[in-house]
C-alpha cells in the first residue's frame, strides 16, 4: 500500500460530497454477469483460487517515521494455510498469528484488472480489531509510470489513526482525499463506483442511498506542489483488487497487547 504518509499530513483534507451518480445495478445472482467475482466456495483449508488471486509470501516495507518499521513491530505476509485459506463456509480467511519470534498476516491480490466504468464491492467481517492489526480492502495500479490507489476500507490498530476511506492520486501519499469512517466487527459491504465524473463510496449499499464519500474527477491537489493529479481517467488505466490483514507497521502499531490469532473474513468480492 502506497498511502502511508497521508496520516502524517492529517485528516483535515476531506472531499466535499458531490452529486450522486446513477447507481449501477448488481446482477441478480452470484452467477450473473459479473466482470469478476469470487464467492470463496473452495474446500475447507484450501488456498483461494489461484486463477483469481496471488497470495503474498513476503513482507512489504513501509516507509514512515513513526518508528513501527522496526523488525519487532513488523509482521510478515505468509503464503501459508495458517494465514490465508478458505474456511469451507464460503469465506476467505486472512488470519494474523503470533509465533514465538514473529507475527504473520495475509494478503491476496487479484489477477484481474478492471477499467473505468466499474463498481467494486466486497462483504467483510473484521474479527481483528485489536492492537497491531491493519486490515484493508483496496484497489491498486502497479503499471510502471502509473499511480493511484483507492482504499475502500482501512482500519488501524495503532490506536492513533481513525479508520478511513481514501483516494490517492500519486504513489507518495501527498495527493489524497480521505473520509474517516466507523468500523465494527459486524458483516458489512463496502462498495465503490468509478466513472468519468469521479469515485463514489457506499457502506451496506441500498438502492437510492447517496454515497457517504465522493471524490470528483477534477483532480486532487498535491501537498507539496501546486498541481492537481488524477490518473483514474487516463486511457488504458486499470485497477486490481487487494485484501490484506497486516500486523505491525506504522498503521498496525505495536501488537504486543493485541489478541491473536485475529481474522478478517471475506464472504465475496464482485465487480460489475
Stretch-by-stretch model annotation:
Residues 14-15, 207:
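Residue-level detector of secondary-structure transition/capping positions
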Residues 28-272:
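GH16 jelly-roll
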Amino acid at each position: 500500500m502506497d498511502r502511508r504518509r497521508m496520516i502524517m499530513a492529517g485528516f483535515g483534507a476531506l472531499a466535499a460530497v458531490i452529486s450522486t451518480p446513477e447507481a449501477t445495478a448488481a446482477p441478480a445472482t452470484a452467477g450473473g454477469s459479473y466482470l469478476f467475482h469470487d464467492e470463496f466456495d473452495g474446500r475447507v483449508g484450501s488456498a483461494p483460487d489461484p486463477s483469481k488471486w496471488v497470495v503474498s509470501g513476503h513482507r512489504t516495507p513501509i516507509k514512515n517515521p513513526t518508528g513501527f518499521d522496526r523488525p519487532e513491530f513488523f509482521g510478515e505476509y505468509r503464503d501459508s494455510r495458517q494465514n490465508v485459506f478458505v474456511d469451507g463456509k464460503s469465506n476467505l480467511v486472512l488470519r494474523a498469528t503470533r509465533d514465538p519470534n514473529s507475527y504473520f498476516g495475509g494478503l491476496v491480490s487479484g489477477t484481474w484488472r478492471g477499467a473505468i466504468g466499474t463498481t467494486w464491492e466486497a462483504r467483510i467481517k473484521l474479527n481483528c480489531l485489536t492492537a497491531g492489526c491493519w486490515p484493508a480492502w483496496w484497489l491498486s495500479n502497479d503499471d510502471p509510470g502509473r499511480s493511484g490507489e483507492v482504499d475502500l476500507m482501512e482500519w488501524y490498530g495503532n490506536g492513533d489513526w481513525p479508520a478511513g476511506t481514501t483516494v490517492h492520486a500519486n504513489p507518495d501519499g501527498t495527493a489524497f482525499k480521505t473520509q474517516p469512517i466507523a468500523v465494527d466487527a459486524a458483516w458489512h459491504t463496502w462498495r465503490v463506483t468509478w466513472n468519468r465524473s469521479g469515485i463514489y463510496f457506499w457502506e451496506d449499499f441500498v438502492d437510492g442511498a447517496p454515497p457517504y464519500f465522493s471524490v470528483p474527477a477534477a483532480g486532487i491537489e498535491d501537498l507539496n506542489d501546486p498541481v492537481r493529479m488524477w490518473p483514474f481517467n487516463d486511457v488504458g488505466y486499470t485497477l486490481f483488487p487487494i485484501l490484506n490483514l497486516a500486523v505491525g507497521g506504522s498503521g498496525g502499531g505495536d501488537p504486543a497487547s493485541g489478541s491473536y490469532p485475529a481474522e478478517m473474513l471475506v464472504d465475496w468480492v464482485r465487480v460489475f
